């Protein structure tokens, strides 16, 4: 999201989040919820890339507190946030955890039905569905924020292929970091419960 960066398209973001609320969907974020690059010890920082409302002596606090207010309408839908390189960079340089602070303050302030769960830089998510009163299904996601560059031509697909090749048991491999948007279906051969060869997407 890089929510606090002036280049974040807040109108488009709000449109997507409002649609999630309308559809009763769960909102999950795979890292880089914040940008937070304009602090004192960040060599990438540039004060022209900071919103006026965040240009304060307590820059990190201002961003976190503003985000807690801005995301309030999505309190009962925003259920998971993982770390990205922007958040881990703040933890490394400033010895404070911006996501933990956001999640704790958000959950305390808005008291959502299901508190936001703070994940890691990578991990597993299992989403459970109940299509009817007697049936239960699950969908397993292996998430990893990502690392390295995406590549002008490949758009990060090579990293996804590597991740998928070393991951077993996931219905979906979810990566971010390279600022590209695509979905890729990979068909694999496997055996079903009766040891019959099948193809699975």
Please place each PLM-identified region on the residue numbering.
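Short beta-strand scaffold segments in enzyme catalytic cores
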Residues: 122-126, 183-184
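Short, glycine/acidic-enriched loop or turn micro-motifs at the edges of active sites
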Residues: 2-3, 35, 148, 180
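Flexible, charged surface loops at secondary-structure boundaries
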Residues: 19-23, 73-75, 135-136, 165-169, ...
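Short, conserved, surface-exposed binding loops centered on an aromatic residue
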Residues: 115-117, 128-136, 162-167
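Conserved beta-sheet core of the metallophosphoesterase superfamily
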Residues: 138-201
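Core catalytic region of metal-dependent phosphoesterases/phosphodiesterases
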Residues: 3-119
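Short, structured patches in soluble enzyme cores that scaffold and shape functional sites
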Residues: 83, 129, 143-147
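Beta-strand-turn-beta hairpins that frame and shape the catalytic cleft
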Residues: 124-141, 200
């Amino acid at each position: 999201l890089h929510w606090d960066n002036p280049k974040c398209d807040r109108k488009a973001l709000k449109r997507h989040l409002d649609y999630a609320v309308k559809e009763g969907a769960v909102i999950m974020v795979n890292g880089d919820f914040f940008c937070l690059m304009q602090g004192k010890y960040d060599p990438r920082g540039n004060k022209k890339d900071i919103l006026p409302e965040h240009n304060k002596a307590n820059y990190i606090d201002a961003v976190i507190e503003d985000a807690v207010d801005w995301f309030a309408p999505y309190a009962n839908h925003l259920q998971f946030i993982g770390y990205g390189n922007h958040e881990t960079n703040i933890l490394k340089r400033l010895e404070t955890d911006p996501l933990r602070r956001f999640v704790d303050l958000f959950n305390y302030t808005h008291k959502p039905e299901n508190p936001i769960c703070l994940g890691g830089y990578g991990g597993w998510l299992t989403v459970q569905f109940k299509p009817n009163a007697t049936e239960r299904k699950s969908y397993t996601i292996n998430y990893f924020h990502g690392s390295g560059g995406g590549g002008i031509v490949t758009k990060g697909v090579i990293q996804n292929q590597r991740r998928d090749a070393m991951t077993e048991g996931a219905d979906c491999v979810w990566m971010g970091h390279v600022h590209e948007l695509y979905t890729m279906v990979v068909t694999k051969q496997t055996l079903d419960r009766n040891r019959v060869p099948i193809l699975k997407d």
